[in-house]
Amino acid sequence: MRIKATVERLPGGMMLVPLLLGALCHTLWPQAGSTLGSFSNGLISGTVPILAVWFFCMGATIQLRASGRVLRRSGSLVLTKIAVAWLVAVLCAPLLPIGGVSSGPLAGLSVLALVAAMDMTNGGLYAALMQQYGSSEDAGAVVLMSLESGPLISMLILGASGLASFEPQLFVGAVLPLLLGFALGNLDAELRQFFAQATKTLVPFFGFALGNTLDLSTIAHTGTSGVLLGVAVVVITGLPLLLADRWIGGGNGTAGVAASSTAGAAVATPALIAGMAPQFAPAAPAATALVASAVIVTSLLVPLLTALYARRGDARSG
């Protein structure tokens, strides 16, 4: 049976299919973890420890050595995306309830969902698109995008926009696994290769554990708003990223379009933020479902738009 190939036909499938299975498990048997206990409970409720290992392994993949041009290109994209997410948070905070919109086509939408969906790029998708439509320097820009992994950037944005305050040790705790992995990966290339193998392996495990915090009714309730959020991510972050790539990064804009996606790891951000800032707890389940939808929508739209933009540029140069 070609289970893996079938699952991967869905954009972000290795994250989203286990997430849906976890949500199904939680909907049909909410007490499964506490009833089974032991290792089964660890798989069902172990979102944070599984993600901690994933962040460590992700940190190990970040290489210290990169050319100035690559750092300029990746830095312009990362900083632009963070700035856009911060601006959206500032503008939308007075308009949206802290617990999210309760009904209508924007049901579940919250500042937490917006920030989580907009501040983290799908690095794998970006690298694949740049290998096809960009240069090696474009593809190398993924080196700094790995720093967006985890809740740290969302914490900084929510704190800078005045929506939350976090104790200093929480920032340290959020970034420490990534830094430890980064240090080991740069001290020993063999360790970097060893830990890098686990980054993809752990994805379905934290997807399943995260799904066990959701109810299928929540996912159904936020269906329309999830699609709208995905489109909004591409539109709202795409244009500034395109301009930043052209004016700051020295590219032709293709890399900017390719970076206007939502990373699969962003699905975990609402729950992690809610664990540190309880005022976001009511918004977290719906925000998780919304971000999961945004992952799918952006994974479908971004490759199409990147291809169209790249071909348009080729036609002009030709």
Curated annotation (Swiss-Prot):
Gene Ontology molecular function: 2-keto-3-deoxygluconate:proton symporter activity
Membrane topology: Multi-pass membrane protein
InterPro entries registered for this protein in UniProt: 2keto-3dGluconate_permease, 2keto-3dGluconate_permease_sub
Keyword field: Cell inner membrane, Cell membrane, Membrane, Sugar transport, Symport, Transmembrane, Transmembrane helix, Transport
Top-level division of the source organism's lineage: Bacteria
One GO location term (cellular component): plasma membrane
Transmembrane segment boundaries: 10-30, 42-62, 82-102, 109-129, 139-159, 163-183, 201-221, 224-244, 257-277, 289-309
Subcellular location as annotated: Cell inner membrane
Major site of localization recorded for this protein: membrane
Reactions accelerated catalytically: 2-dehydro-3-deoxy-D-gluconate(in) + H(+)(in) = 2-dehydro-3-deoxy-D-gluconate(out) + H(+)(out)
Summary of the function given for this chain in its UniProt record: Catalyzes the proton-dependent uptake of 2-keto-3-deoxygluconate (KDG) into the cell.
Family of this protein: Belongs to the KdgT transporter family.
Protein name, as recorded: 2-keto-3-deoxygluconate permease
Organism classification: Bacteria, Pseudomonadati, Pseudomonadota, Gammaproteobacteria, Lysobacterales
